[in-house]
Amino acid sequence: MENQKMPISSVPILKDLSRPIANFPPSIWGDRFINYTCQDENERAQKERQVEELKEQVRRELAATVDKPLQQQNIIDATQRLGIAYHFENEIEESLEHIYLHTYVENTCFEGSDDLYSVALWFRLLRQNGYRVSCDVFNKFRDNEGNFKNNLMEDAKGLLELYEATHLSVHGEEMLDDALEFTKTRLESVVSHLNYPLAEQVRHALYQPLHKGLPRLEAVYFFRIYEAHASHNKALLKLAKLDFNLLQSFHKKELSDIARWWKSLDFATKVPFARDRLVEGYFWVLGVYFEPQYSLARKIIIKVFTMISTIDDIYDAYGTVDELKLFTEAIRRWDVGSLDQLPEYMKPCYKSILEVYNEIEEEMDNQGSLFRMHYAKEVMKKLVEGYMDEAKWCHEKYVPTFEEYMSVALVTSGYTFLTTMSYLGMGEIASKEAFDWLFSHPPVIEASESVGRLMDDMRSHKFERERGHVASGIECYMKQYSVTEEEAYDEFCKRLVKAWKDINEECLRPYHVPKPLLMRILNLTRVIDVIYKNEDGYTHVKKAMKDNIASLLIDPMIV
């Protein structure tokens, strides 16, 4: 049955249809990123030599702090915040293991163990690197009634570090929930009285907590903060700036290659109703992994990302139900012969999907990882079937219960799809067992999907309601529970808190899959927090998104 083809005569001839066209804004970038001038080879080689020399210097300095936990923690923190921790993964792992064993397992006091900043930094570094340390370490900063002591009120630096640490909380840690409320309220009240750079750090953290930010983007912000501290490590800062510029050139070359491929497809002409968001998509992918060793992985996922963005718009911004049934069936068949069954406007997209997957399949075959293609195809089929369900709801003007909506909307968030595709180019670490784990829909995946869906609905439901889109989660929740929009928002915010705690829990040891695979899920979730913080920054590209893209792909660091 699966390989039978619908006769051509059954393809409906549809004229003068009322289509749900969204009138998405065009790309703001034009051909800006197509042309890339390669850096002078001698100049690049010289910078690479400098980077290697500075890396050795930083390694020596890190090794010299082995018996100075606080100093060691500060170097590790700076290295991670400046975006160069990928050069020192083994050294950082060994250092944190040493700190964990000597200060937590053996309960040995360390310099600064009675200082809020030092303890909060210790807690955050260990938690964000997977160590299951207890929040009871903060008991010493609370009075007999369980409130945080009054003498902390003036310790803005310590409060800021505690605030950052609270974002790594898991379920059952009411102390950290209280600490978040306490530190947030206090920092908001004192920020206008602080001096630079602490004032800037507090403002930024209140807007974008470190744990939910994109590492590469947070590094851009942290450069100027770190440099403003008189005690900053000059070798570390220079290394970070040189490395940033080298990587930026590398990313611009990648984007240039992808942009030429994208232009050759001519989707702007062939599928003009869809969002043209290649550059924004590449920014999204950089949020998932920016490190040079993931170049192949980025090239795979960005091509698939552009395809799925276009398919999404075919389903909810142009296609009729009858046309979409044909496309859904064509994806199920996964056969070039299905092209003849599709309306003309669908053919370029379907043909391109098959071509992209064939490219990926060839690469996987070369790596001896052909088994991955089964997962890549299955997750695409499931996503498209979810789009079809939503299209039927929209056509029928059906408002599902919130639970029914979420059962489909978690799939159409695209985050299981993107996670699956993000694993394809990651080498041997992405084993069959890892894909089976992913397809078992573990809590961390459901939590990531929830963040994606809830934040998307909160930021885009008004625009989508105006253009006749399927009812969003906000509308479904309001109708089912007879609540106001504000009350629905409050419930969504509570669910977001729960989802982040689920993610934090899954990122603690022992890991179910290797940590690099978990990091893709965490980073995909972070992308949503950044792009959808105040608006749908992917669909409607405004100043915040433009500035973020410019900081990663246009503006170099001054060394």
UniProtKB/Swiss-Prot annotation:
The keyword Lipoprotein does not apply. Mg(2+) 2 binds at residues 312, 316. Keywords: Lyase, Magnesium, Manganese, Metal-binding. GO terms for molecular function: magnesium ion binding; terpene synthase activity. Binds 3 Mg(2+) or Mn(2+) ions per subunit. A motif (DDXXD motif) lies at residues 312-316. Mg(2+) 1 binds at residues 312, 316. Its EC number is 4.2.3.-. Its cofactor is Mg(2+); Mn(2+). Mg(2+) 3 binds at residue 464. InterPro entries: Isoprenoid_synthase_dom_sf, Terpene_cyclase_plant_C1, Terpene_synth_N, Terpene_synth_N_sf, Terpene_synthase-like, Terpene_synthase_metal-bd, Terpenoid_cyclase/PrenylTrfase. Gene3D superfamilies: Farnesyl Diphosphate Synthase, Terpene synthase, N-terminal domain. One of its GO terms (biological process) is diterpenoid biosynthetic process. It is an enzyme of class 4 (lyase). Sesquiterpene synthase. Belongs to the terpene synthase family. Tpsa subfamily. This is Probable sesquiterpene synthase. The lineage of its organism: Eukaryota, Viridiplantae, Streptophyta, Embryophyta, Tracheophyta.
